[in-house]
């Protein structure tokens, strides 16, 4: 790395001094960027790292920020297949409170904790007269294996393609790279009374919804 010297004059009242000023050439820091894509799994989502990062568009940010289903609004109906492949409509549950929770994926650490926490408190939800329903983008076969392995006593619905998630405006995390974890409590008339979002403390969803149901 080459260097050159120059000088400048410093005036201090009656004393004049010439000080050397060292001029250094700075080169750009070299760092490697992976040219091949690499993948890692994070809470059920596959994140891809490559040398190209696409900018976040304003339209995608709008989808992340603004919910389409809000508190006080009648929840839009939908029909999805359950873990046994049978079609289930949301309107089927009118007349009783419904705890509807969207989660990223079956068999991931956070989602398994959440599912088992709902299982362990299922009798408390039943005592409150509420039905518990889980929704993710996994297919019915995945849900069946997941429910069987962990002995889940409630319904899991398959939202392949995430259509219902998008229709409801469930916000994602990490700029949409990670499917959001959001729970809705509907009253017996199908009106949204509580919306709770907490990606990284999945078991808090059970605490907050039970607290709300007991106070209602």
Curated annotation (Swiss-Prot):
Concerning CDD domains, the annotation shows: PRX_BCP (cd03017)
Record-annotated Thioredoxin domain positions:
69-216
Q: List the disulfide bonds.
A: 111-116
Q: Which InterPro entries match?
A: AhpC/TSA, Peroxiredoxin_BCP/PrxQ, Thioredoxin-like_sf, Thioredoxin_domain
On tissue specificity, the annotation reads: Expressed in all tissues at the exception of roots.
Question: What catalytic reaction does the record list?
Answer: a hydroperoxide + [thioredoxin]-dithiol = an alcohol + [thioredoxin]-disulfide + H2O
User: Which residues are catalytic?
Assistant: 111 (cysteine sulfenic acid (-soh) intermediate)
What is a single Pfam family found in this protein's UniProt entry?
Answer: AhpC-TSA
Q: Which PROSITE patterns match?
A: THIOREDOXIN_2 (PS51352)
Report the pH profile. Optimum pH is 8.0.
Entry keywords, A to Z: Antioxidant, Chloroplast, Disulfide bond, Oxidoreductase, Peroxidase, Plastid, Redox-active center, Thylakoid, Transit peptide
Q: What is its EC number?
A: 1.11.1.24
Domain of life according to the entry:
Eukaryota
Q: Name one GO molecular function term.
A: thioredoxin-dependent peroxiredoxin activity
One GO CC term, this protein: chloroplast thylakoid lumen
State what induces this protein. Highly induced by oxidative stress. Down-regulated by salt stress and by ascorbate.
Task: Spell out the note in the miscellaneous section.
Answer: The active site is a conserved redox-active cysteine residue, the peroxidatic cysteine (C(P)), which makes the nucleophilic attack on the peroxide substrate. The peroxide oxidizes the C(P)-SH to cysteine sulfenic acid (C(P)-SOH), which then reacts with another cysteine residue, the resolving cysteine (C(R)), to form a disulfide bridge. The disulfide is subsequently reduced by an appropriate electron donor to complete the catalytic cycle. In this atypical 2-Cys peroxiredoxin, C(R) is present in the same subunit to form an intramolecular disulfide.
Q: What does this protein do?
A: Thiol-specific peroxidase that catalyzes the reduction of hydrogen peroxide and organic hydroperoxides to water and alcohols, respectively. Plays a role in cell protection against oxidative stress by detoxifying peroxides. Involved in the photosystem II protection against hydrogen peroxide.
The family line of this record is: Belongs to the peroxiredoxin family. BCP/PrxQ subfamily.
What is the recorded name of this protein? Peroxiredoxin Q, chloroplastic
What species is given as this protein's source? Arabidopsis thaliana
């Amino acid at each position: 790395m080459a260097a050159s010297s120059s000088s400048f004059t410093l005036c201090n009242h009656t004393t004049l001094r010439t000080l050397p000023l060292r001029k250094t050439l700075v080169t750009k820091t070299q760092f490697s960027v992976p040219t091949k894509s690499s993948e890692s799994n994070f809470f059920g989502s596959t994140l891809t790292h490559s040398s190209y990062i696409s900018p976040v568009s304003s339209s995608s940010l709008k989808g992340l920020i603004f919910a389409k289903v809000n508190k006080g609004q009648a929840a839009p109906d939908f029909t999805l297949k359950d873990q046994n492949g049978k079609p289930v409509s949301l309107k089927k549950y009118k007349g009783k409170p419904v705890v509807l929770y969207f989660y990223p994926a079956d068999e991931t650490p956070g989602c398994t904790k959440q599912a088992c926490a709902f299982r362990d408190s299922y009798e408390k939800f039943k005592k409150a007269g509420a039905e518990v329903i889980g929704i993710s983008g996994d297919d019915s076969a995945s849900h069946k294996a997941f429910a069987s392995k962990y002995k889940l006593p409630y319904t899991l619905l398959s939202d392949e393609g995430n259509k219902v998630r998008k229709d409801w405006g469930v916000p994602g995390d990490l700029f949409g790279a990670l499917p959001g974890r959001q729970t809705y409590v509907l009253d017996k008339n199908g009106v949204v009374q509580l919306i709770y979002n907490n990606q990284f403390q999945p078991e808090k969803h059970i605490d907050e919804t039970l607290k709300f149901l007991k106070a209602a």
